Amino acid sequence: MATMSADLGAPVSWAGGISMVISAGTIVSALMSDRMTLRFGAGKVTAISVALTALALFGFSMAPSYWVLILFAVPYGLGAGGVDAALNNYVAIHYESHHMSWLHAMWGIGALTGPYIMGYALNAGQGWSWGYRYISILQIVLTAILIFSLPLWKQRVPQPQSIETEPSADITEQSAAEGLAQEPSREPLGIRGVLAIRGAREILIMFFCYCALEQTAMLWASSYMALGKGIDKTTAAMWASLFCIGITVGRLLSGFVTMKFNDPTMIRMGQVLVLLGVVVMLLPLPQHLGTIVGLMVVGLGCAPIYPCVIHSTPTYFGEDKSQAIVGMQMACAYVGSMCMPPVFGLIAQHVTIILFPWYLVVFLVLMIVMHESLRRKCGGQRIG
């Protein structure tokens, strides 16, 4: 970002404006996902959304000024929110929980790969513009793959799901046969319609809390280690990356664990691991071992929560309502990710950064309360 700032003649602090525009776009497109998917289908929405991100990234690479970056941040945000909502709901309906976990593990791998691609471009003397260009080329290739695969999207039938037990073979065959039937036409659910559904508020607050916890840990872990624990800044940044590694590795592993346990159990196991990680962070172990190990355990605990909450949504609320609810989940995720880390920044500045673990606990406790309330209201039955 410092290199871009010098080339574009814009202060580094203005990067926050780009992030705000992207976040606003993701929220808008996530809220529109039910309407768009009903009209065009999940495959087309996903392909168009990825194409928008490819266009935006190529635009970033050609941007001569800060304001052009702002302009291309709009399609980037719209595309990111669209693909998140449409693809997550499609996978939740048509695939099993381990597929969802591995899908989100790929997000972690992508998030770790992106900086390396940018670093390669900078080290090769090609500049930051080529870093964005390389990534845009990958997105263009992905768009082409999605377009050619559109006929395959129509061939999938919904996976029979149950929160409590595995379905019998007869139920599986019946559900598969029903999945081939044409879905009856309906009006898209608006925000009020979603909020009126029993249990929807709980699952939305869960998502807000999870993403607030994850993003706060991701953005403030290194500062907590450096300023709160006295660890060298370079070392702190290295150890803080264990959180992201924990999430990615955890999702790869939890994909196998979901073959044994259902989604609510996976969510509870993740919550217990997050709590255990925070407790370890607070232990006065030598060489800051508690902070380092605890942070990685928190990452491992976060791993199954996000994908399992999404995958359980059609089971709780029905496939006819899940797209609208998943879209709202994505919107809540972006709001939590965008708003809550800065709130902790104010706490760190005006009180103390030592409160970092306790800040995570607040969101964890609220998440647990909402999950148990959701289970009491909806149980293992679909809400009609």
Task: Please describe what each predicted stretch is.
Residues F261-V309:
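C-terminal transmembrane helical hairpin of 12-TM major facilitator-type secondary transporters
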Residues S29-G41, R251-D263, A348:
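Helix-to-loop junctions at the C-terminal end of transmembrane segments
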Residues W130-P151, L355-S373:
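Symmetry-related core transmembrane helices of the 12-TM Major Facilitator Superfamily/SLC fold
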Residues F72-M106:
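Cytoplasmic helix-loop-helix junction between adjacent transmembrane helices
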Residues V28-W67:
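Conserved MFS/SLC helix-loop-helix module at the cytosolic interface between two early adjacent transmembrane helices
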